[in-house]
UniProtKB/Swiss-Prot annotation:
Protein name, entry field: tRNA-specific 2-thiouridylase MnmA
Listed InterPro entries: MnmA-like, MnmA-like_C, MnmA-like_central, MnmA-like_central_sf, Rossmann-like_a/b/a_fold
Pfam families reported for this sequence: tRNA_Me_trans, tRNA_Me_trans_C, tRNA_Me_trans_M
Annotated organism of origin: Herminiimonas arsenicoxydans
Gene Ontology annotations of biological process type: tRNA wobble position uridine thiolation
Domain of life: Bacteria
EC code: 2.8.1.13
Keywords, ordered alphabetically: ATP-binding, Cytoplasm, Disulfide bond, Nucleotide-binding, RNA-binding, Transferase, tRNA processing, tRNA-binding
HAMAP family found in the cross-reference section: tRNA_thiouridyl_MnmA
Catalytic-site annotation from UniProt: 100 (nucleophile), 201 (cysteine persulfide intermediate)
Compartments reported by the entry: Cytoplasm
Site keyed Interaction with tRNA: positions: 125, 349
Gene name of this polypeptide: mnmA
Catalytic activity from the UniProt record: S-sulfanyl-L-cysteinyl-[protein] + uridine(34) in tRNA + AH2 + ATP = 2-thiouridine(34) in tRNA + L-cysteinyl-[protein] + A + AMP + diphosphate + H(+)
NCBIfam families xref list: PRK00143.1, trmU
Length: 372
């Protein structure tokens, strides 16, 4: 019987490298695919594409798999980056990794892999897939959290559909990150000690405000407290996100006390796009930073349909602990009420629902309801 062919995305990082080795050990025919998805500034000091390709090719040689490079820069710019900029211009804070996974890593990449005769694709994400074997959902594929809760990436994968998940393997889903590092060291992979990437999907770890400034027009405006007092000037609403503390530029006013009695560090609490006004508050637990409910749109449900109205858990940001909530979901919209108020619920970010370890899907936060 011919081996199943798996095309794996190899980024030059440790996770995808160890994933390639694991797949080969499991008896698959493995082909590596390195994706180049950004080329606006290949010569920038922040662009690591060349080194990443060298690392990926070196690992492929050690592991014993073929590897090729493919350029998805045009697809990334059209499907991900353009939407990323539109969201920032609208005053929201998007998560490009969510859209990149759905549109590039599991769509453009999947399509290319099929042209290479792949039976399955694989990535180095920390998540799991499981086929339902009985009951009314028999044959459905579920997206589950990774065993290593500290590295779980199901939040970023919640927009994947049945067609995508049914063709996907996550070799690291049952493995802890510490074990991945050990395997890389034992294999003497050339990137065994390489740091994990923490930058924007495919764009890297460059200064974010400087990067946005190249693509967005901006207009300075007033920075106000809830009582309407002007305490400074913002450089442009696109450069701020709810809950932000650093980079506001009011470090010398920490002891200032507002009429509401709050004092302490300043946080971004609200963006009034219509009036180009940034509202800031003092104190981590200021009421303007706490939300009891949210609304979301652009829903994507893993099972292809909205979950029934029952108690679930939600995440409104990566690595947040699951939060108990009640919800009413349709194919297109979500209304969610938290059991306990949540901090800095941010329009543009994703609200993702879970039933235990099972990721149900989610959508883009459009608004939140303050506790006061």
């Amino acid at each position: 019987m011919a081996k199943k062919r798996v095309v794996i995305g190899m980024s030059g990082g440790v996770d995808s490298s160890v994933s390639a080795w694991l797949l080969k050990e499991q008896g698959y025919e493995v082909i590596g695919l390195f994706m180049k998805n950004w080329e606006d500034d290949d010569d920038s000091e922040y662009c690591s594409t060349r080194q990443d390709w060298i690392d990926a090719a070196s690992v492929a040689d050690v592991v014993g798999v073929d590897i090729e490079a493919v350029n998805f820069a045009a697809e990334y710019k059209d499907r991900v980056f353009a939407e990323f900029l539109r969201e920032y211009e609208a005053g929201r804070t998007p998560n490009p990794d969510v859209l990149c996974n759905a549109e590039i890593k599991f769509k453009a990449f999947l399509d290319h892999a099929m042209l290479l005769g792949a039976d399955m694709i694989a990535t180095g994400h920390y998540a799991r897939v499981r086929e339902v074997t009985s009951g009314p959902d028999a044959g459905q594929v579920q997206l589950l959290k990774a065993v290593d809760a500290s590295k779980d990436q199901s939040y970023f994968l919640h927009r994947l559909n049945q067609a995508q998940l049914s063709k996907t393997l996550f070799p690291l889903g049952e493995i802890r990150k510490t074990e991945v590092r050990k395997i890389a060291e034992q294999l003497q992979l050339p990137n065994a000690s390489k740091k994990d990437s923490t930058g924007i999907c495919f764009i890297g770890e460059r200064p974010f405000r400087e990067f946005l400034n190249r693509y967005l027009s901006y207009q300075p405006g007033p920075m106000k407290t809830p009582d309407g007092t002007i305490v400074g000037e913002h450089v442009g609403l696109s450069f701020y996100t709810l809950g932000q503390r650093k980079g506001i530029g009011l470090g010398g006013m920490k002891t200032h006390k507002n009429t509401d009695g709050n004092s302490g560090p300043w946080y971004v609490a609200r963006k009034d796009v219509a009036n180009n006004t940034l509202y800031i508050v003092q104190g981590h637990d200021h009421p303007w930073l706490l939300s009891s409910a949210l609304s979301a749109g652009q829903m994507s449900w893993v099972a292809g349909r909205a979950p029934s109205e029952e108690l679930v858990a939600a995440k409104t940001r990566y690595r947040q602990a699951d939060v108990a909530c009640s919800q009413h979901a349709t194919a297109d919209n979500l209304a969610l009420a938290f059991d306990t108020p949540q901090w800095a619920v941010t329009p543009g970010q994703s609200a993702v629902l879970y039933q235990g370890d099972v990721c149900l899907g989610g959508g883009i936060i459009t608004a939140s309801t303050l506790t006061e």
